[in-house]
Amino acid sequence: AEWREKGLIEVVNSRTKQVLQMNVEVLEDIEKNKNNSLSIKKAVKNLNKPLLIIHGTEDLTVPIVEGEQIYNWSNKEFTEFERIPACGHTFDIVHPFKKSNKKFDLVIKKTRDFLDRKFL
């Protein structure tokens, strides 16, 4: 009720402590699609295009098992799953961005290599 009345809800990011605002449209979208029409599983199973999943093995925000589950649902002919060891959700990049690091550089390299192989 409060979300609707205010038109937004504030959620604290547990990692950064940043206060994030979600407009009531997010709630309306969730309600409108509660029948699973916005199913990640269904979308991934129906995707017949190249898909690259890059996941930090120490991700506390989205555990690696969720990335593995997406990979398991995917068409293996088109999908690659890259695990970045000892790395969290942001690949050890902080906000605001100041500089890169070896782990993030590896993510960029793997992404570029994937795009070059699949689209050039």
Q: Where do the language-model regions lie?
A:
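Hydrolase active-site cap/lid region
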Residues: 1-26
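Catalytic active-site module of serine/aspartate enzymes centered on a nucleophile-bearing elbow/loop
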Residues: 87, 91-120
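Catalytic histidine neighborhood in serine/cysteine hydrolases
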Residues: 74-92
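Short alpha-helix in the alpha/beta-hydrolase fold that links the catalytic acid
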Residues: 49, 63-73
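Short, glycine/charged-enriched secondary-structure capping and boundary segments
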Residues: 1, 66-70, 96-99
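Short beta-strand/loop motif that positions the catalytic acidic residue
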Residues: 46-48, 53-55, 59
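Active-site nucleophile elbow and catalytic-triad environment of alpha/beta-hydrolase enzymes
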Residues: 21-44, 49
